Amino acid sequence: MSRRVATITLNPAYDLVGFTPEIERGEVNLVRTTGLHAAGKGINVAKVLKDLGIDVTVGGFLGKDNQDGFQQLFSELGIANRFQVVQGRTRINVKLTEKDGEVTDFNFSGFEVTPDDWERFVNDSLSWLGQFDMVCVSGSLPSGVSPEAFTDWMTRLRSQCPCIIFDSSREALVAGLKAAPWLVKPNRRELEIWAGRKLPEMKDVIDAAHALREQGIAHVVISLGEEGALWVNASGEWIAKPPSVEVVSTVGAGDSMVGGLIYGLLMRESSEHTLRLATAVAALAVSQSNVGITDRTQLAAMMARVDLQPFN
C-alpha cells in the first residue's frame, strides 16, 4: 500500500526556544536557551512522520539568505525537499516558556512572496502534489500571499488530492476552510471565532464541529489544550485526555498531534486508536524541547496512559 505524504509550509521559521521563570516587562530577562531549530508547522509534522517510518516530501517557501539550516535538516532526516527559494530571509520566532508552562511567542517578519513567486509555486506544486496519498497544509500565510489566493490554491489542490489535512489560524484558517479540506484541526478559540459565538460547553463545541462537517469537511479535530482533543467524524465523537507530564515546552505539540493523526489514518487504524496515538505523540512533544520521536517504547507507554472515551 502506498504511504506517501507531502507537507506544505508557506511561512516556515527558525524557532529560538528558551525558558525563563517569569517574563518581567520592561526589565532585562535572563533566558536559558533550550534550542534553535529549523521549523515551521509542516516541517514539524514531517519530522514526526519520518520518525514513524513514513516517506515525506516537504514544500513551501524558504528565504535565500538563511536557508542552510533547513537544507541541512532535510538532508539529515532524508526528507525530499521541494521548497521554493525566494529573495530575503526566513523569519525567526522566539518562543519563551515560563515556569507555569505559559508560552509567549515573538514572531518576527521574514521574506515577501512576489506575484511571480506565487504563480510559480502554484503551477509547480499542483504539478506534483497529486501523486501523494495525503497533503498536509500548515501554518500562516507569508507576506505577499492574500487569503483569496490561498483559498483558490487550496480548492485547486483538493481536486488533485482529496485528502488534505489542514492546520492553521487567523486569516489563513478562515481562507483554508472555504476549500473544505478533508481534515481540519482548529483549537477551541479558533472554532469560536469561526462560529461567531462562545462555545462554553462540550456540546457547543461538538455542534460547531458538526457545522464544519456540513460544509464537506470529513474529520474535525478540536485541540483543547491540557484537556486533550475532540475528534468528530461520520463514525462518532471521541475525546482523548493526555497523561500528566512534566512540561518542558509546548512548542510543536499541535504539529506532533497532526503527525500522529496522519500516521493513524495512513495505516487505516480506527478513529479511537488514531486519536490515542496522536494524543500520546503530542504529550511526548510537551515533555521535550523539540518535536520528534526517539523512543517507540516510550510512545507506546504514553499511549497506554491516554484516557479516551466516546462522547455521549
PLM-predicted stretches and their roles:
Residues L49, N187, G254:
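Short, conserved phosphate/pyrophosphate- and ester-handling motifs at nucleotide-, phospho-/glycolipid
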Residues D105-N107, F132-S140, D167, K185-E190:
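Short beta-strands and strand-loop turn motifs
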Residues E27, D51-D133, A301-N312:
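Conserved N-terminal subdomain of the carbohydrate kinase-like
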Residues V5, I54-V56, N81, I164, ...:
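Hydrophobic anchor at the start of a short beta-strand
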Residues K50, R158, L266:
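Gly/Ala-rich phosphate-binding loop of Rossmann-like dinucleotide-binding domains
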Residues P147-E237:
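Conserved phosphate/ATP/ADP-binding segment of small-molecule kinases
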Residues M1-G59, Q67-G69, N312:
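Glycine-rich phosphate/adenosyl-contacting loop at the front of the ribokinase-like
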